[in-house]
């Protein structure tokens, strides 16, 4: 998917909702690159580029609807032939017994053709708006590429506030 100019590779088990989320993103103006089978090549600059095979290009399988042609249904602006892969989002089933990164400080990567791509695992459950989460992840990646890391900046502010509070408490104890 091309989400806000960021090439997003969606991963997850069958039936997790990847195609439905992609369809919702297309309806919001984002673009399909490939569904189900993404072919990937590594460029000489260690960039990854993904595309769909000619056989399934511009097509998507949606449970209950069957195979649909995104280009015919939504127009040429809803698809693109290839896109650099810049972010991997793995949709996983929500499990209350598991601990999930709530701050966004865990930086994971997903290796593709020996290139390390930033990875986020997004827990999904009924009622979660997965396409909005994907869009926010792409927006956050855009900020990170520009040097703005919200989670790190928050952690730094929190660390400073705690250090200041300890310093004030120490001064109060000394006086």
State where each predicted segment sits.
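A short local loop/turn or secondary-structure capping micro-motif enriched for an aromatic residue
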Residues: 18, 58-59, 126-128
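Short capping micro-motif at the N-terminus of alpha-helices
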Residues: 10, 50-51, 119
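Pre-Walker A adenine-sensing motif
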Residues: 1
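Conserved NTP phosphate-binding and transfer environment spanning the P-loop NTPase/kinase superfamily
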Residues: 86-175
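Conserved nucleotide-sensing/catalytic segment adjacent to the nucleotide-binding pocket
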Residues: 31-90
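Glycine-rich phosphate-binding P-loop
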Residues: 4-33
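A broadly conserved detector of short glycine/acidic/proline-rich loop/turn motifs that flank catalytic sites
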Residues: 7, 14, 44, 54, ...
